[in-house]
């Protein structure tokens, strides 16, 4: 009736990235375990618990960086789904995907806090050739991540998403996305009867066979949902899911030059959510924001 998973993808070099992801997983997992001891109270306030856990992990990362200067600049993504009977809650910061496989269709449930959605929109709008967009060096640059500073964007829906018996969830680091959605869909479908372990093993084998020299580290969890009294009235395209309100960012970033970004009013809602701006320090000065594998700063970066 109840369960959760916590996944974090670290960055900032091998050593610092490993520390960052361990801090996030340890803090969030511990908070969820502690708060869930009161089942009724936890279910009534899952969203606040998840956000508080993320804030706690972010503060711990800041404290660690202050006392260990060699890890300055480290950061980590976070995706943590919580399942209570047929209700799915989650918190997501960064680009680690949370996939749902239902009725032969794969869909990413959480927001992608990277420049990928911007670039894809520019390709669809004819502002960028498809091959350029597909291989764009900024595709994986993050617009939100845990780095011990203000969190730019948090995806944590107020209302739960309803699960159905037979649904399959895949929580992963972005290393899984070296496989196409079509490949992931095929593997999940072909191994669904074998359960979560069979799906996970086949995904790993496919990545090994791909043998991409640029392959990122990979971590994922596969969850197969089975319920005795499944509610057949809910589906992934229900108004309850489609109309959920997105969280407003506390601080916005300027990931690409303003003239290159389409007017949010003219963009689809899923893309327009990733708004642009400049992060400012307490003194009002524009400061760089550390994103995956590089500095992406308002003054051009390093």
Task: Mark where each language-model region is.
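PP2C/PPM-type serine/threonine phosphatase catalytic domain
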Residues: 1-302
